[in-house]
UniProtKB/Swiss-Prot annotation:
KW Aminoacyl-tRNA synthetase (keyword) present: no
PROSITE patterns: CADHERIN_1, CADHERIN_2
Segments on the Cytoplasmic side according to the record's topology features: 655-1040
Gene: Dsg4
Disulphide bonds in the chain: none
PANTHER family per record: DESMOGLEIN FAMILY MEMBER, DESMOGLEIN-4
Extracellular side: 50-633
One GO CC annotation: plasma membrane
Name the UniProt record assigns to this protein: Desmoglein-4
Amino acid sequence: MDWLLFRNICLLILFMVVLGVNSEFIVEVKELDIENGTTTWQTVRRQKREWIKFAAACREGEDNSKRNPIARIRSDCEVSQRITYRISGAGIDRPPYGVFTINPRTGEINITSVVDREITPLFLIHCRALNSRGEDLERPLELRVKVMDVNDNPPVFTQNVYTANIEENSDANALVVKLSATDADEDNHLNSKIAYKIISQEPAGAPMFMVNRYTGEVRTMSNFLDREQHSMYNLLVRGSDRDGATDGLSSECDCRIKILDVNDNFPILEKTSYSASIEENCLSSELIRLQAIDLDEEGTDNWLAQYSILSGNDGNWFEIQTDPKTNEGILKLVKMLDYEQEPNIYLSIGVRNQAEFHHSVASQFQMHSTPVRIQVINVREGPTFRPSSMTFSLRGGMRGDSLMNYVLGTYTAIDMDTGSPATNVRYVIGHDAGSWLKVDSRTGEIQFSREFDTKSKYITDGMYAAEILAIDDGSGRTATGTICIEVPDANDYCPVIYAESRSVCTHASSVRIYVNDHSFGAPFTFCVVDESPDTADIWDIRSINGTSAILMTEQTLSPGPYQIPILVKDSHNRACELPQTVLLDACLCDDYHVCLHSSTTGIYTGDTIWVTDDMGTVTDDGLRQSNVGLGPAGIGMIILGLLLLFLSPLLLLMCCCKRRQPEGLGTRFAPVPEGGEGVMQPWRIEGAHPEDRDVSNICVPMTASNTQDRIDSSEIYTNTYAGGGTVEGGVSGVELNTGVGTAAGIAAGGATGTLRKRSSTIGTLREYQDTGMNMAFLDSYFSEKAYAYADEDEGRPANDCLLIYDHEGTGSPVGSIGCCSWIVDDLDESYMETLDPKFRTLAEICLDTEIEPFPSHQACIPISTDLPLLGPNYFVNESSGMTLSEAEFQAEMAAASEPMIHGDIIVTETYTATDPCVQPTTIVFDSQLPPNVVVTETVMAPVYDVQGNICVPAEIANTHNVYYAERVVASPGVPDMGNGNIGDTCIGPVMSGGILVGPEIQVTQMMSPDIHISQTTRSTSPMTSQHRVTRYSNIHYSRQ
């Protein structure tokens, strides 16, 4: 470790060199600024060239001249030249002036006057060394002269008198007040350390308070404070510096503590019992006064008493209140007493305070009862009204003399001594707001003195009130009673009834009647008046609800008119003066209860008959008409009917006859058959029920054309069902449906001109429920499914490793089971080359190579590419016997669109799993076509045998972001594929040679009812899987 020691020595030498080069150290110290009361950081510089002598300390309030010179400054430069020393700062050229002086030659600094630390605790002197030209030879020096503190300031309290409050019975050590004193001497020094002490307490006695020596907090010594004994304490507190030493300075202050009252004393009554007397039938506002004694502070809620009657006041004759000035309880008589009933009454009075009792004594309180005897004096009593008020009812409809002669009733007074009606009394009406009443002075009979208005303001809620007085002739005593009169409302309109039916049958006589009243509402009461003999016996009336009833009879009537008098009463049991007569006409009726002749029904009231004619109008002798008529709703319905009658010919003119179009593709809904492949069947395999069938692969020659079609389209869609190919003289599994929204173009073997209709170029059957499974389709199906599973395994790196099985202790009975875990063993893989097609996919997975399929035994028919521009258009109908029809037409050449700016190109290859002998067609981009083209290549060959190329025109060279994808489309030979849909949109015409040209072509994938084919990209579906994406920066154009 010698190198470590050597390193430390080198670092120490380097540090010393740096220290020698630097000329000074700066040290910061904390200094208090007395003038503005702030603390600042000052710097003390230690010079390498020592040219000062530290100043001596100075004591305040003393003559420090005997210590002169208190400091001396000297520079090394004085050896070579003459130096003048100068000083400046506080005490020199700033207040206080003239405290320090300096010898400019020797540099001695002297103090010349007495200093005060409380004014200037520190003097900062700036020293300079000047040459003869007045230039600084040294850096200016700061000289600090500290003034030493002397205990020359006594403590000073912030207040001369402190005032505090505290409740009596407070807990011990409760804070009362905090005293505060300051000392001008140096902080954090013994001269400024103050100690507090209680010197005296008034009133004298046991000390009740103590003070904290250092904080000045005054607290209680115990919980014995009692306001009833002493309500005020005066304390004399002294504060001494030097921590209370005898040589310290001190000052004193007064502390006045007021004891607050709490409700800790229970009130008691001055006497143990009370008594009083009063005459019967008299009231008293001050029957007796009860004095309560309470030691708490007067005028407060702790002192005010709250009186209560505990018992004896069964008739609520007495009340007791508190006089807040004297704290007395005033007993009042609020109801008259009866000597005959209660000659003596004994009360129990209790008292407590209005404020709650203090928690220290609340549990000890018990209310004590004080007895009070009330003696009732018997006197000769005057008359009185029993009951004190009486209600009378007035019959409605009374006017004039009948009202004046009507007697409401008699209201007389009784003699309380005897209990019989009073004799020597006279009656007069007292308060009568409307002056409507009069009374017989001897009998007390009450009558009306004038007519009155039932709508008068003196009538409240149908009730009129007045007073009656009974005056004793002997004693002059007066009794007062109240008269209440129920005034009925004027019934200006009688309840009017009317019948529902105008005629009744003789064998089933019943009619419904209704009541209408303007003044009073339901319920109404109905009764038949027996004016003529046996009227009430024949007719019976029953109420249905509050406003209607049914009039009926159980007897068989004779044909002819009938008059039934009916009396109707309202809810106040009032009715019209005369009963109302209902006129009915009994007639012979047929089986449908219809009268054989018309009749007239009316209502007879006295001399007036209200008749209802056939038109429903009620007349009063032909003069008055009722309010029955045609309303706005009826008029509106009539007008609406007339309008509909006039508009019906116009509506018939708008109707047109249309022929029913023949049913075609998509005109009816084809339900999924019961054996559809979209449903799992009992045989637990995908597809139709397995059948042993010999299905040969059909490969027929196809016709193609190199003619390029150009079309400008805005809304074009194409659906393609591809199976085996297009044949000459026959059709096998190809269907092309092209729909053009707005397009014009040329097609060989198809429709020409402006294509706006949906046409079927080549069609065949799409349902193959009775055919077998296409082995080529299964081959492609499982191959693509295996590729999809391989793609998923590539996305799972955690499973991409060799798995070693754990040894479980015993060997396997099958010895070769362990070899399957090592794929690196040498295996003879040559036998996999001769496997059947159904095992070819498994072999390709194991060998990681693509096995060439066996050559087809069927000869490949060459595709003819020399097709004329004008050719036949073949249509194949779906039937067992194929019928071919031929049509020729001349197409019109459409103008080519202008090339667009080069952009991205998406090229999509869609392969159809079918016979491997068909070669893929070629996509050719014409030079007139713009970029941004999506191209779909449809190949009638298995996926693994496709060997084509993509040709791109020259004008889209150097184009980036070319998207290339492969999709597998199921063959129509697969069962239940006829119900599937192929593609949503395909823009551009389909040529017979398989060439697709268009400004923007997009083909979507084939949709199939098969659940595996309908899976999305990157899933386990073998029919729709995306394999590779290649980006081309340069695409060469070639034509084949």
